Amino acid sequence: MLARSARLLHSAELAANAIRAASGAPATAAAAEASFPSTDDVAAKTKKTGNRIKTFEIYRFNPEAPGAKPTVQKFDVDLDQCGTMILDALIKIKNEVDPTLTFRRSCREGICGSCAMNIGGQNTLACICKIDSDTSKSTKIYPLPHMFVVKDLVPDMNLFYAQYASIQPWIQKKTPLTLGEKQMHQSVAERDRLDGLYECILCACCSTSCPSYWWNADKYLGPAVLMQAYRWVIDSRDDYATERLHRMHDSFSAFKCHTIMNCTKTCPKHLNPAKAIGEIKSLLTGFTSKPAAEPSAF
């Protein structure tokens, strides 16, 4: 997994260099740093002309600059000329003020999880987080906490996705199954057990708000991955619940959760990862067991 990630990063670097060469962009780190807008340039482009000017303080980090250190840069945005969400402000700043501002985004509807970041001290999605209309206070925007930063508001998600892959998030059967031959039956009650679990969009807001995950990310799976693990353990169509639980039966994978509840408080989809982790602990300790699958009528 790590070797594959290294190859992907190397390929991405080669692709980036090719794009720079084709577009005439600066190829060296020093040239790249020099091409970034200065504070004076930003101030000139964000001249306060409206009545509802909002200041955004945004975390900046350029890994291509020699000896780069994180900084916080201020941008003024006229709310009368901007959409209502934080992502609207970020896009406006990138399009009209500073094209070097870097962040992830995709669906703009709270479905993909790409634009997860820390806004005003709370992990959330920029696309569904409304701009505070109080112009007397600035809004602070940082990347997800306790993650390596790729650039600006872009965190490195490699470890998070590697942990997700480790739980084998797909249905596994012990009996031969030919796709299309028959349906994998679920009763209404069995399907209802997945509600509040399958809706997770893997944005990592919960995991990166968890102190246990901050200090033990190499061993503790974290709220998001554990909730996904429970989703597959409890699925009536899956035959490998025992094996899935066995892989988590140690002192760190699940039991490092101290029920701090930050995960449930911050989830932008209003899910309850802490409850799912509690259910996993009950299964691991033998207090509860997975309900037997109902007989199939198919």
Swiss-Prot record:
It is found in: Mitochondrion inner membrane. Coiled coil: none annotated. It catalyses: a quinone + succinate = fumarate + a quinol. Its cofactor is [2Fe-2S] cluster; [3Fe-4S] cluster; [4Fe-4S] cluster. One of its GO terms (molecular function) is electron transfer activity. GO terms for biological process: aerobic respiration; respiratory electron transport chain; tricarboxylic acid cycle. Its EC number is 1.3.5.1. It is a peripheral membrane protein. Residues 190-220 form the 4Fe-4S ferredoxin-type domain. Residues 59-147 form the 2Fe-2S ferredoxin-type domain. Keywords: 2Fe-2S, 3Fe-4S, 4Fe-4S, Electron transport, Iron, Iron-sulfur, Membrane, Metal-binding, Mitochondrion, Mitochondrion inner membrane, Oxidoreductase, Transit peptide, Transport, Tricarboxylic acid cycle. Binds 1 [2Fe-2S] cluster. Binds 1 [3Fe-4S] cluster. [2Fe-2S] cluster binds at residues 107, 112, 115, 127. Pathway: Carbohydrate metabolism; tricarboxylic acid cycle; fumarate from succinate (eukaryal route): step 1/1. It comes from the Eukaryota. Pfam families: Fer2_3 (PF13085), Fer4_17 (PF13534). PROSITE patterns: 2FE2S_FER_1, 2FE2S_FER_2, 4FE4S_FER_1, 4FE4S_FER_2. GO terms for cellular component: mitochondrial inner membrane; mitochondrial membrane; mitochondrion; respiratory chain complex II (succinate dehydrogenase). SUPFAM superfamilies: 2Fe-2S ferredoxin-like, alpha-helical ferredoxin. [3Fe-4S] cluster binds at residues 210, 257, 263. [4Fe-4S] cluster binds at residues 200, 203, 206, 267. Belongs to the succinate dehydrogenase/fumarate reductase iron-sulfur protein family. Component of complex II composed of four subunits: a flavoprotein (FP), an iron-sulfur protein (IP), and a cytochrome b composed of a large and a small subunit. Iron-sulfur protein (IP) subunit of succinate dehydrogenase (SDH) that is involved in complex II of the mitochondrial electron transport chain and is responsible for transferring electrons from succinate to ubiquinone (coenzyme Q). This is Succinate dehydrogenase [ubiquinone] iron-sulfur subunit, mitochondrial. It comes from Caenorhabditis elegans.
